[in-house]
Amino acid sequence: MTKNKYRTSLDGLVIENPVESFFNYCIERENIRIKRESGEAFPWSEDKIFQKGRFLNVFREDDRVSKSIINFAKPLTDDLPLLIQALFFSRWCNRQETIDKLNHVDLLDADKLKDKLIQLEQWENFNAYPVQDVMWNEKTYSRIDTATTLFYEIKDDLTEIVLDSNLDVIQATKNINKRFKMENDFPIFMALIDIAWFREDVIPITSQVPTGIGAQPYLDRLQEYLGLESHQAVATEMISLQKEYWPEAKRTFYPIDIEYQSCECRKYFSYINGTKKFEGKNRLIVN
């Protein structure tokens, strides 16, 4: 099991109403996205934390990498094994600049794809979630070999595992990681939940999702405040509460959004708590 380095990030910090704070965070972050995309000059918020720290957009489909993945994989919607290969490749890469240089046809030749990636100054994203080596049939594959060779070879196996998981993304993540043996299964989950953008008959967008280590501290706060039995129950309740706290949002939240933004809220309140610093990849740099 992965050691949660974020577990104590909110220790000692009082958040009087974590539900209200969650939605206030989301509203402000979405307003920042709208102002930035409309061409307004920086800063887009009076909040000093938003002026100095990097945060993901509220809705996953608005993130740059997500937009690139959607464009890359969309032609494969009706070919489920290739779609799954494309999404797993994309989440192992997780770098917009790389994905934008490729076409889904590149997936058909693993050797040429690997050569293309090697020629790039940097093909993968080091600044997001960690991507570890993968085991398959007692053989270890590096990140680049997994993304290119392994996913090409096992796309049918992955498809069978996903379909046998009966629309359950949590179970599908566990079933695949029984084979991969990764300490952190988050990249698997990300690739699987991406299927919902294209094939809700395989993974519904309304699926309950596992808790990532980054989201756990804030979901724990929400769970305690709401008096619920699980993080999945928290997601269901927060989706219901959106009508009260943020009725004008551009769409209804799904469970993945609650998990996703709980991670961002943990980051935000970690700055307040002094357990996170505005340095390195955390610092917002506006060009």
How would you describe each model-predicted region?
Residues 43-125, 159:
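Phosphate-/polyanion-interacting regions in eukaryotic proteins
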Residues 80-85, 127, 132, 252-261:
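Generic structural motif recognizing short loop/turn segments at the entrances and edges of beta-strands
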Residues 75-79, 179-180, 206-207:
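A general structural signal for short secondary-structure junctions and capping/turn motifs
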Residues 97-179:
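Alpha-helical ds-nucleic-acid-binding substructure associated with the helix-hairpin-helix region
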Residues 1-69, 144-171, 189, 193-287:
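C-terminal accessory module of base-excision DNA glycosylases/AP lyases that mediates lesion recognition
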